[in-house]
């Protein structure tokens, strides 16, 4: 099971020494080809899904962060890879809140998306809700909706 645990301070613009703390585990099929964490030419640090070309977690040189987990449900086939959600956010300088508004959520199998930029930490799932900003506290995200 993919699991992300994170702690975020209410005022991340203050940028204290530890304004964002992350623990993450990716649980994927062993036979799915991947490349280990490395700097992409586009300027972010992430592993790479060699099957679909995206990534599940990454951070840019300027501190922007993105991660995605699957949403537990019967498998569905979609044209768009969930790994592109992370990749596209990190490759563009759009604000997290604006990026979430541009997504065609129905194009993807079930997902939970976590983004961080200069405006804060943002969460969106295509299996419930319109997305939300997470201002503080310790939160955990797995294969179901986050409870804030």
Go through each PLM region and give its residues.
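A short linear-motif detector with a strong N-terminal bias
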Residues: 1, 35-37, 45-47, 90-94, ...
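Extreme N-terminal starter segment of soluble prokaryotic enzymes
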Residues: 1-2, 19
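Short beta-strand scaffold segments in enzyme catalytic cores
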Residues: 3-7, 55-59, 110-116, 122-123
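Intrinsically disordered, low-complexity boundary segments flanking structured domains
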Residues: 6-11, 53-56, 99-102, 130
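Glycine/small-residue-rich interface belts in oligomeric ring/scaffold proteins
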Residues: 10-85
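Internal, conserved structured core segments that host functional sites
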Residues: 64-143
């Amino acid at each position: 099971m993919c699991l992300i645990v994170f702690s975020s301070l209410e005022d991340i613009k203050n940028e204290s020494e530890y304004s964002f703390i992350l623990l993450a585990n990716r649980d994927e099929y062993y036979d799915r080809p991947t490349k280990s964490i490395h700097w992409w030419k586009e300027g972010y640090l992430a592993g790479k899904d060699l099957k679909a070309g995206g990534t599940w977690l990454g951070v840019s040189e300027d501190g922007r962060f993105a991660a995605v987990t699957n949403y537990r449900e019967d498998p569905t086939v979609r044209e768009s890879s969930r790994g592109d959600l992370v990749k596209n956010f990190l490759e563009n300088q759009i604000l997290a809140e604006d990026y979430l508004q541009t997504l065609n959520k129905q194009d993807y199998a079930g997902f939970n998306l976590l983004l961080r930029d200069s405006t804060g930490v943002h969460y969106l799932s295509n299996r419930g809700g319109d997305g939300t900003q997470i201002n503080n506290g310790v939160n955990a995200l797995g294969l179901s909706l986050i409870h804030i």
